Each structure stands twice: as C-alpha cells, then as structure tokens.
Amino acid sequence: YGANLRGANLYGANLRGANLYGADLYGANLRGADLRDADLCGADLRDADLPDLTFVILGEKYFISITNGEYVRAGCQNHTVEEWRKYSKQEIAEMDGRKALKFYPRLLDIIDFYIGKGERPDWLTSKEYADEVTE
C-alpha cells in the first residue's frame, strides 16, 4: 500500500494487475504502460503522464478508472467497455446487488462521456427494472 513512485519513468511498463492502491505516482510517466486490471484506487496521479484515453473518475459510488479507452474498472470489477455495455440484469445484480443495479446506468453514462456513445441493454428501459430500482 502507498508505494512511492513519484516522478518514476514507467514508460511502456507492464503494470497489468499491479496493486497500486494509494501509490504516489505524482509526475510519473505512464505513457504506453499496460494498466489493465491495475488497482489505482486512492493513487495520486497529479501531473502523471498517462496513456491516451486513461481516466480516473472520483466522487462516484464506486472507484472508476478507464484504461487505454478499452478497460473500465468500477469498484473491484474490471471489464472491457463492450462487456460493460452488454451485461444482463442478473450479471450486474451478482456484482453488488441493488446498489450495482441502480448505479449501472450512471456507469454507462460515464463510459459514453469519456469513450463515446454506445449500446445499452434493452432491460434498462423495462418497467420491471424501473420499479425495482425505485422501491
């Protein structure tokens, strides 16, 4: 927890699955780094040089990061953008119950904003879903 990588040159580094929870990456060069499945929750990324289309979104119900415009981590779940867009209601519910079901449209809004508009599952517009999340 909290590794000091301030100003480190991690250009092209394979950080896939790395636990960078709480790491100090202030000013680090992460261009070209493979950050898929990396845990960046609580990491200090100020002035870090990140790969294209890489974002850390704070202030949501879950920690959210988008890596290389391809992978999205929400809480402890890390999947491709396409996988997130196609999940069934049951698959989302299995992640974190009703809380995840309520948050899922917001997550898709975030993905749409940062990556571009995409498909949404039909079940999101069902009356059954609307009733379930407003109970």
Please place each PLM-identified region on the residue numbering.
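N-terminal capping/linker segments that flank leucine-rich repeat
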Residues: 51-135
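Tandem repeat scaffolds
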Residues: 1-62, 66-68
